[in-house]
Structure formats: structure tokens, C-alpha cells
Amino acid sequence: MGVSHRNRMCVFACLLVGLIGIPVWVMGASEIPGDTLYLQAEDAVSEGSYEQAYHLFMNASEAYAAEGNGGKKKEALRQAKRISWMFAEMTLNRTAADETIQTAFPNFTADEREAFLEPGASIQFESDGQVYYFEGIARNIQYHNKTLSQNFTRKLGESPFFDQISPYISAPRDEKNPLYQNHTFRGTGVLSIPRDQLPDTGTLQIWYPLPVSIDSQSDVQVLSVQPEEYVVSGPVTTGTIGEVYLEIPLEKFRDDFLNVSVNVSWTTSPRILDLDPETIPMYDTSDPLYLRYTKSQPNINITPEITARAHDIIGDETNPYKQARLIYDYILNTLPYSNVPHSYLAAMPIPESDFMHNTGFGDCGTQSAYFAALCRAVGIPARAPGGYQIVPGHQGTHFWAEFYLPEYGWIPVDVTVAEAADWAYNATPEQAKEYKDFYFGNLDPYRFIIQTDVDESFSGEPNPDILMTFV
């Protein structure tokens, strides 16, 4: 979603200040040429002085404005915005990070807290000589420790996902077992933006996600889109991503909130594995599907290091189904779930798969992209679909993974939901194994699927004049 630029610089500058938490200082635009300031900003970026670079890009935009160079002014603002996103979730200095850990885990000693502040022990980066820590540092400490995670679910009195799925895995697959039935859902999505957070005039561009029709998600119906008169294209519910695109003239709205709503219904089916792993046909390596899903893409990146890791994981195994299982087990057993600062990754930019490989930290999207990258690195087509998981009582955005086998099609894998067995205080070892086995090759019907792969894009590209974006 974006706002086209028409006298919007002040709004964009305010957004940057709010994100980065540092004031904008501007030298007289006539004192230093815009190109000089821009080059100084690029030098600051290369030196890791991102705050200094932010100020220099902002100053460059002012200098370019004074010089009458609107194109370069916008580019300088875009670069400043990119830097601001580095700091959007990396908000804690060392003292604040230590206090956050102490609040969450008051029984930790000072030395124990200090260990989590060291390089490699938490998500952090350095700018202008200061280390910044991810605001989710305490949550990640819990996720990386089974005892802490199980203490949390014990206190909660519930083991999310595990409690909702595990009892039905081995139960009779009859009409009383919801895990093996189709489910029809109806939902309304509402986007409500405070009017005072938007410019007075201009065009608000909105790409609103919708469910997409695939084998396990059918009978997709878009019942309404409001305000209907501003729909430019769509609704689209076929292909690789579901969407409806709107353009809203802001000068026509004066209410306290600008509201956009979509009402949809869809039917989901469980995906249950039924194959003989000993009879997997050979891949046709010239097939367009094979070529597409075994190459690098922005967030499923195949590096020499990832390729080496993938071969270490699979060893001498040549069966692609068994190779994928080895990769699944590797991630599940050695790379625990973590919250991730995606705005920081996008700004740097760092591919999701690279971040997981290099740091050991990853949420559902990062784990799924890494699974796909490891599979692709050994010649297994793979991808990372996404949307929402809608397990009763535990709805939220979600990604998982799929790998492709000839004659069988796309095989689902959900490392993240499988890991819920490790967080469950009430899971026996046998139950945990059964639950983890289920999520390799099978998928529950509690999904709202928007896109078939992580790097699928909405139709068209945002207007190049867009300066403000919302996630």
C-alpha cells in the first residue's frame, strides 16, 4: 500500500523521525551541493555509520529541492527511508536490552544476561559505534530454551497448536475428526487508517490480499469490497497470489478514519501424504517448473555456503523425499523458532534464507525460505507459500514450505507448527514425534492461503513516486 507523492515530503520526514527515533537536522541547502551530500551519505553507509548516513540523505534531499532537482530529492528520501527501516525493530541499546531481559527473566544473573548480549547470541547490529538489539530479544531467549517455553505453556494452561492438532492425528478419520475434513470459512478484513496520518490530497494505492484458488483451497468467493467505486483491478483469486487493487483519492475523505473492507469465503481441504518413497520418479530437469523452483530468488537464495550445508545434511542419500526429510529434521532439531526483524532484513537487504543460515535465527517465513533454499541447493524444487494459519484460537500470519515430487506434486512441510511440540508442556516423547512426523508431508486444513511462494508480487509495481509504505 502506498501514497503517491504530491507535496508529501513533510509527511515522509515525520514518518522517518518516528521510526528511527532521532531528530532530522538540516544544514543550509545552499551550503553544500546535493551530490556532495549524497556521496557523503553513501560513504557513511559503507562505513556502517547508518545514523550519520540518514542525516546526510535528508540533507541531500533538502539541497536537491533547493537546486530544483525533484528526481534526486526523491531518491535521497528513499534512501533515508530505507535506513529508517533498519532501526524500526532494532530499537534497544545495550542497557535497554539488558533491562528487557531482566524484566522477562528476573531470576537470570547479570552474567547470564550478559551472555545474551554478546555477538551471535542475539539479533543485533552496529551503527555509528553503538550496538542495537532487536526488540524481541527476550522472546527469542524463551523460544531457544525448551524449559522456558514449556514453563510458559504450563503457566498458560495450554500448548498452542499441539493441543488443537495432536489429539486428532491418530484418531479415526471419520466425519467427527475435524483434522481430516473440509472446512468452509467466511471472514471480513478491515483496514482502518487514521485520516490525520495521511496527506490531505493525493492517491492512496492499496493492494489488498485475497485467498488464492489452489488444490487445497477452493470455492473462493469475494463477497464484497468497499469502497467498491475505487477498485481499479481485480478481485483476482487465481494464479500465484490473490489480490484486489484500489486507488483512493484522498481529497474526497474527511472522516476520522479511512476504512477499506473485504468480505470473502473459501473452503480448505487437509493435505494428507499418500506415497511410496521408494518409487519416486526422476525429475525432468528441463521442465519449466523444475527450472523455476531450483534457482535462487530474492529470499530463497542459494549460496555456496548453503549448498555446502545442504550436502552435509543429506550425506549419501539420493532419494529426494528422504533428502527433504533430512533437511526438515535438521531445521527442526538445530534451528529453533525466533522472532525476526523483517524490516531490518529488507532494508539491508538480507535474504531470509541467508539470515537463517548465518545467524541461526528465523521465524516461520525465515525457516521456510531456508528449507526451500536447502532443497533447491540439492536439486529438489521447493517454495514457501504463505498467508494465515487459522487454527482455532490461534490465528495469525504464517508461512510454511513445499517441495515437489514428480507424479505427486507439491508436498507440504511446516517446520514452525511442528516445533510447537517442543514448547508443549504436556507432550510425551511419543506424542511429540507423531506430531512432528505429521507436519512433514501433511498439512492441517486451517489455512488462508494468499500466495504460492514468498517472493510472489502483487500485480504491477508501486508508483515510483510513492514515499510512504505500510506493512
Give short role names for the model-derived ranges.
Residues 35, 39, 43, 47, ...:
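Hydrophobic/aromatic-rich core segments of domains that either
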Residues 267-269, 337-338, 361-363, 389-392, ...:
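Solvent-exposed loop/turn segments at secondary-structure junctions
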Residues 320-327, 360-375:
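Active-site nucleophilic cysteine motif
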Residues 32-59, 63:
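Alpha-helical segment of the N-proximal tetratricopeptide repeat
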Residues 45-48, 238-245, 252-354, 358:
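Acidic low-complexity segments
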Residues 55-84:
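Short, charge-rich amphipathic alpha-helical segments embedded
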Residues 79-272:
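Intrinsically disordered, low-complexity N-terminal segments that are enriched in acidic
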Residues 1-30, 401:
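Secretory targeting signatures
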